[in-house]
């Protein structure tokens, strides 16, 4: 099962993430958990989130990039849900053998995320990749949708279909 942990503080403003979720939602065995819908008060139900993670074989962290990082509720979710003794540390093997895909949208162009005057995309992904590996997850190459503020609807839809194809390819390769 694919579990999408979706974290967008302003979901009604995001055409890109909306298209991505619509495409992913057409696949079988996909569960979408919208953190800002479930926890507008930031009071996360840790047990429910851990149960959802336990059912998954592929976990997707989908969100817009905010200040070169994740939105605040996703960071809090990581702090609470990926608990010592459950996700890492002594006895913390609940996520071992599962895969993680980082699916991120950005307002900047792909060339904005190259080494030079801006941090490289590989550099920006390091904290998430380190978190995944620390929890025993297999890190997959990220899916990034760039220039989302200026893309026309056809371009957004095409990129969202590419996202769906990434998920479908993973399902077919992993019988999940």
UniProtKB/Swiss-Prot annotation:
Gene3D superfamilies: 3.40.50.360. The lineage of its organism: Bacteria, Pseudomonadati, Pseudomonadota, Gammaproteobacteria, Enterobacterales. PANTHER family: GLUTATHIONE-REGULATED POTASSIUM-EFFLUX SYSTEM ANCILLARY PROTEIN KEFF, GLUTATHIONE-REGULATED POTASSIUM-EFFLUX SYSTEM ANCILLARY PROTEIN KEFG. It catalyses: a quinone + NADH + H(+) = a quinol + NAD(+); a quinone + NADPH + H(+) = a quinol + NADP(+). GO terms for biological process: positive regulation of potassium ion transmembrane transport; potassium ion transport. InterPro entries: Flavodoxin_fold, Flavoprotein-like_sf, K_H_efflux_KefF, KefG/KefF. It comes from Salmonella arizonae (strain ATCC BAA-731 / CDC346-86 / RSK2980). One of its GO terms (molecular function) is FMN binding. HAMAP family: K_H_efflux_KefF. FMN binds at residues 8, 14-17, 65-68, 105-108. Homodimer. Interacts with KefC. Regulatory subunit of a potassium efflux system that confers protection against electrophiles. Required for full activity of KefC. Shows redox enzymatic activity, but this enzymatic activity is not required for activation of KefC. This is Glutathione-regulated potassium-efflux system ancillary protein KefF. Its EC number is 1.6.5.2. One of its GO terms (cellular component) is plasma membrane. It comes from the Bacteria. It is a peripheral membrane protein. Keywords: Cell inner membrane, Cell membrane, Flavoprotein, FMN, Membrane, NAD, Oxidoreductase. Pfam families: Flavodoxin_2. Its cofactor is FMN.
